Curated annotation (Swiss-Prot):
Further facts: Present with 14800 molecules/cell in log phase SD medium.
GO molecular function: 2 iron, 2 sulfur cluster binding; electron transfer activity; iron-sulfur cluster binding; metal ion binding; oxidoreductase activity, acting on NAD(P)H, heme protein as acceptor
GO CC annotation, single: mitochondrial matrix
Organelle targeting peptide span: 1-16
Domain of life from the UniProt record: Eukaryota
Listed transmembrane segments: none
Primary role: Iron-sulfur protein that transfers electrons in a wide variety of metabolic reactions. Involved in heme A biosynthesis and in iron-sulfur cluster assembly. Transfers electrons from adrenodoxin reductase ARH1 to heme A synthase COX15, a heme protein that catalyzes the conversion of heme O to heme A. Required for the de novo synthesis of Fe-S clusters on iron sulfur cluster assembly protein ISU1. Interact in its reduced state with ISU1 to productively deliver electrons for Fe-S cluster synthesis. Essential for coenzyme Q biosynthesis.
Name of this protein: Adrenodoxin homolog, mitochondrial
Domain 2Fe-2S ferredoxin-type: 61-163
Subunit structure as annotated in this protein's UniProt entry: Interacts in its reduced state with the apo form of ISU1.
Encoding gene (name): YAH1
Pfam families: Fer2
One example of a Gene Ontology biological process annotation: electron transport chain
Length: 172
């Protein structure tokens, strides 16, 4: 632990990692209000799940989720949003444990075969994670890796009955 003196003249204790971050990237440590004495920071990038933009009239794309109970939910979304962001933004049961970094398989979806070929080929990282997914099918993909586009307007994806978080070795 190191002691530092803030701009306001307060003494604070910070870890060696925080001190290194402060020296190399001072913009990472920012004051959130003028009254707080803490300098919050995070070593992971901020993700904006749940903050979806409303599509402009005429630019809406549609996606239908087939839920675990068989019911269907259709949403109008913007181009460029990932299926993971859309699901989480509408409080659907999709964990996304890794935050969309393609490091787990908890956003596994089963794509309707009519739309599967319109998707870009999965990258090696996605294929590696899909190999660990519970209930893998020929049209399985990771929701964090599929961005909405006009090519897949109207896509239908099913949420599998279970997902497996390989990082925690548990089931949800």
């Amino acid at each position: 632990m190191l002691k530092i003196v803030t701009r306001a003249g307060h003494t604070a204790r910070i870890s060696n990692i925080a001190a290194h971050l402060l020296r190399t990237s001072p913009s990472l440590l920012t004051r959130t209000t003028t009254t707080t004495r803490f300098l919050p920071f995070s070593t992971s990038s901020f993700l904006n799940h749940g903050h979806l933009k409303k599509p402009k009239p005429g630019e809406e794309l549609k996606i239908t989720f087939i839920l675990k109970d068989g019911s269907q939910k259709t949403y109008e979304v913007c181009e460029g949003e990932t299926i993971l962001d859309i699901a989480q933004g509408h409080n659907l049961d999709m964990e996304g444990a890794c935050g969309g970094s393609c490091a787990c398989s908890t956003c596994h979806v089963i794509v309707d075969p009519d739309y599967y070929d319109a998707l870009p080929e999965p990258e090696d990282d996605e294929n590696d994670m899909l190999d660990l997914a519970y209930g893998l099918t020929e049209t399985s993909r990771l929701g964090c890796q599929i961005k909405m586009s006009k090519d897949i307007d109207g896509i239908r994806v099913a949420l599998p009955q279970m997902t497996r978080n390989v990082n925690n070795n548990d089931f949800s």
